[in-house]
Design a protein with these regions (language model features):
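Iron-sulfur (Fe-S) cluster-binding segments and ferredoxin-like electron-carrier domains
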Residues: 203, 319-332, 351-368
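Short Gly/Ser/Thr- and Asp/Glu-enriched loop/turn motifs at secondary-structure junctions
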Residues: 13-17, 151-153, 341
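Helical element adjacent to the flavin cofactor pocket in flavoenzyme catalytic cores
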Residues: 68-125
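Short loop/edge segments at beta-strand edges and connector loops
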Residues: 14, 49-50, 98-100, 116, ...
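Dinucleotide-binding Rossmann-like beta1-alpha1 core, especially the glycine-rich loop
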Residues: 1-56, 179-180
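C-terminal catalytic lobe of FAD-dependent flavoproteins
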Residues: 186, 202-311, 315-322, 326, ...
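Flavin-dependent oxidoreductases
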Residues: 105-110, 114-208, 215, 224, ...
């Protein structure tokens, strides 16, 4: 991941992680994860005593029984990484058709026809990476062997000046408790999550759930400054199940017909594995199409570093030049700008800069800029 972020000019922090437990009965789970980590080639992974873990991360509540330490764990801004990969793909000749729903997929004698409300696209191969809807997209052409059920979690984002651990902290849930995750983000915020729930309102939060998250965070990290929350949100992940209702504990890569691949249930650690999955898919495509390696391919992309003296986002110190560069690269909404340069992610959550960014977007669309 570090080398990929370097190529795509995306910030990356290799901070390490601790998976901690306060329950002697859960140590066997850590030992199993240690064995799996060693078998999978995770560098430097080892089991620590409670005293070693507390010395490594003083913010932890005293009483740690054991902890699994993984020094290679890192953090990255997920949407910046995704957008950077998209920009690099465009640099190398890829085309994108955005805001277009797939309504049908059918086979023809030479491959497939992907139908949308506006057009039909004839292709030799289809790669279905539709995330939360991947099973539904495959069902347009072939019966999937797995179905997705969504569950969610609530998240707290703490201000950059809040005290934070130096490592990613995972809490190994005990038999009667719930795990929690605390992530020191590469941007400087602390992200806290882990209260799993079945979905009522997609992407929603509840007062009870957020309070539970506040309480759990303080139990794990007593000095966590949860009063400095600047944002809360809900997120979902796709859990794959077989038709008989059995949970699938791995990624599902389906190949129901020559030239058709579906990636279903790509959840944690999906971001970490995304590049390797992409390389795996590229090898399949090259073999199927008998394609030759593109000698002109350029893996490098330059980040947005344009700056001037006009500050638009006061909280994050984002300049007009940065916002205009994000717009020139394809941002068409305030959220699109936000995910490229970080405007609106600070303490005021965009209350002071949103209208200014909307005006710049409008002027750019009208040709005034």
């Amino acid at each position: 991941m570090g080398s990929l972020c370097e190529e795509l000019d995306v910030p990356f922090s290799r901070c390490g992680s601790l998976l901690v437990t306060y329950d002697a009965y859960s140590v066997s789970r850590l030992e199993k994860k240690l064995k799996n980590g060693i078998q999978n080639g995770v560098p430097g992974v080892r089991l620590l005593s409670g005293e070693e873990a507390e010395a490594m991360e003083p913010m932890l509540k005293p009483g740690v029984v054991a902890a699994l330490y993984a020094p290679s764990t890192g953090t990255v801004n997920p949407w910046q990484l995704g957008i950077a990969a998209y920009e690099n793909a465009r640099q190398n000749g890829a085309e994108a058709v955005l805001n277009t729903e797939v309504l049908g997929i059918r086979q023809n004698g030479q491959g497939f026809v992907v139908e949308t409300g506006e057009d039909a696209y004839r292709c030799k191969m289809v790669f279905n990476c539709a995330g939360l809807s991947a099973d539904k997209v495959q069902a347009l052409a072939f019966p999937p062997s797995v179905r997705l059920e969504l569950d969610g979690a609530e998240y707290l984002v703490l201000d950059k000046n809040a005290q934070k651990p130096s490592l990613v902290i995972f809490h190994q849930a005990e038999s009667c408790g719930k795990g929690i995750t605390a992530i020191p983000c590469v941007e400087g915020n602390l992200l806290i999550s882990g209260v799993r729930k079945m979905l009522g309102i997609p992407f929603g939060t509840t007062a009870e759930g957020l309070q539970e998250l506040h309480t759990a965070a303080k139990e794990l990290l007593p000095d966590a400054e949860t009063s400095k929350v600047i944002r809360s949100f809900g997120a979902v992940r796709p859990n794959p199940y077989t038709e008989s209702g059995e949970s699938v504990h791995d990624f599902c890569i389906e190949n129901p017909a020559p030239g058709f691949y579906s990636f279903i249930g790509i959840k944690t650690p999906g971001l970490t594995c995304a590049n390797e999955l992409g390389l795996h898919l590229a090898e399949k495509a090259a073999a199927f199409l008998r394609a030759e390696k593109n000698k002109e391919f350029n893996p490098r992309r330059e980040g947005i570093f344009e700056k001037d003296n006009e500050i638009i986002c006061q909280c994050e110190q984002i300049t007009r030049a940065e916002i205009m560069e994000a717009i020139r690269r394809g941002a068409t909404t305030v959220d699109g700008v936000k995910r490229r340069v970080g405007s609106g992610m600070g303490r005021c959550q965009g209350s002071r800069c949103t209208l200014k960014i909307e005006k710049l977007l409008e002027e750019y669309r009208d040709g005034a800029l």
